[in-house]
UniProtKB/Swiss-Prot annotation:
Highest taxon, organism lineage: Bacteria
Biological role stated in the UniProt entry: Represses a number of genes involved in the response to DNA damage (SOS response), including recA and lexA. In the presence of single-stranded DNA, RecA interacts with LexA causing an autocatalytic cleavage which disrupts the DNA-binding part of LexA, leading to derepression of the SOS regulon and eventually DNA repair.
Keywords of this entry: Autocatalytic cleavage, DNA damage, DNA repair, DNA replication, DNA-binding, Hydrolase, Repressor, SOS response, Transcription, Transcription regulation
Family (UniProt): Belongs to the peptidase S24 family.
GO biological process: DNA repair; DNA replication; negative regulation of DNA-templated transcription; proteolysis; SOS response
HAMAP family linked: LexA
DNA-binding region(s), chain positions: 28-48
Organism: Leuconostoc citreum (strain KM20)
Residues at the catalytic site: S132, K170
GO molecular function: DNA binding; serine-type endopeptidase activity
Gene behind the chain: lexA
EC identifiers of the protein: 3.4.21.88
Subunit structure comment from the entry: Homodimer.
Reactions mediated catalytically: Hydrolysis of Ala-|-Gly bond in repressor LexA
Protein name: LexA repressor
Amino acid sequence: MAIQESKQIQVLRFIHEAQLNNGYPPTVREVGEAVGLSSSSTIHGHIERLVKKGYLLKDASKPRARAIEVTDSGLEALGVSTTPGRIPVLGQVTAGAPILAVEEEATEFFPIPDNLMQFDGDMFMLNVRGNSMINIGILDGDKVIVRKQDNADNGDVVVAMNDDDEATVKRFFREADHFRLQPENDAMAPIILKQVAILGKVIGLYRDAIY
C-alpha cells in the first residue's frame, strides 16, 4: 500500500536519501528543515506512523542517530527497486596493445557493489588482458568496472576506442594537438592518437583470486 500523506512521503524520502549519501539517518532537525516542518513533535509523529506502516524500522539497541532505517516496504513505497542490480560484462579490453574488445551483448552479469549502486544502469565490466596498468594494480585477468561516459579529465583511467574500433584501458591525457593514452607500466610506451572515443571511466576493479 502506498503512503497517502505527502509529508510522510517527503519524510521517508529524505531519510532514505540521507542514508544513501551519508551512511546514517538524518537528525529530526534536518528532517524538519528538508520538508518544511518546524515542530519536532510533528516530525516524530510522522516517523512513528511510518514505523507502524512498516516503512521505517527503529532499532532500540543502536544510538539514536543510527536507530532508524528504511525497510524494503518503505523502498517500494518510494518506488525504489529492492532487487539488486547487475553489471553486464561486455567482453574484454586490453591493458596492452588495443584490440577489438567491446561486445554489444553481455557475456555474463555481476552484482553491483553497494558503494556503486548510484550508478546502476550506467556501468559495464570488461575482462582485462595484458599488463600495461600494473603500476596501479590492474592486472591481467582482472575485471574493470566502467561508468559510461564520453568525456574524461586528464589523468582519468578510461576505456578508450580508436578509429579502428580497437579498445584499451589507459590513463587519459588531452594535449596540444593529440590525445595520449598512457600505460601504467614503465616498460611500455604511450599511445598517441589524433582522434579517440571515450567509452567510460574506470571506477572499480574485481579480482577472482588473491595473487
